[in-house]
Regions:
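Amphipathic, interaction-prone secondary-structure segments
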Residues: 14-27
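Short intrinsically disordered terminal tails
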Residues: 1, 74-85
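A short beta-strand micro-motif
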Residues: 1-13
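Acidic, aromatic-enriched beta-alpha/helix-loop junctions
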Residues: 28-72
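A broad, low-specificity signal marking well-ordered, structured residues that form hydrophobic/aromatic
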Residues: 4, 20, 32
């Protein structure tokens, strides 16, 4: 399993903003979970893909988004301001 933080350099969609926008977990099976912080749209969400390449194709914004590997959750720069009730 690998942990990444999605850093958006340019927001072409105008939805998630720039800077740290999501936490990404890539499981050994290839399944990938993307958990968006929800800063600009105020709609935090989690999306699961059966392949990492699908998540990258949809959210990579043609190279305008980087994935920075994190060794532990404590290294994430972004902050989640909400918790489910």
């Amino acid at each position: 399993m690998k942990l990444y933080e999605m850093i958006r350099d340019e927001d072409v969609s105008g939805v998630s903003g720039t800077g740290p926008v999501a936490e990404v977990v890539v499981f050994d099976t290839g399944w990938t979970a993307v958990s968006f912080y929800g800063y600009t749209a105020d709609v935090p969400n989690v999306i699961v893909y059966s392949r990492f390449s699908d998540a990258e194709k949809i959210h990579g914004h043609e190279g305008r988004t980087r994935l920075v590997e994190r060794k532990s959750p404590a290294e994430f720069v972004g902050k989640v301001d909400w918790r489910p009730v």
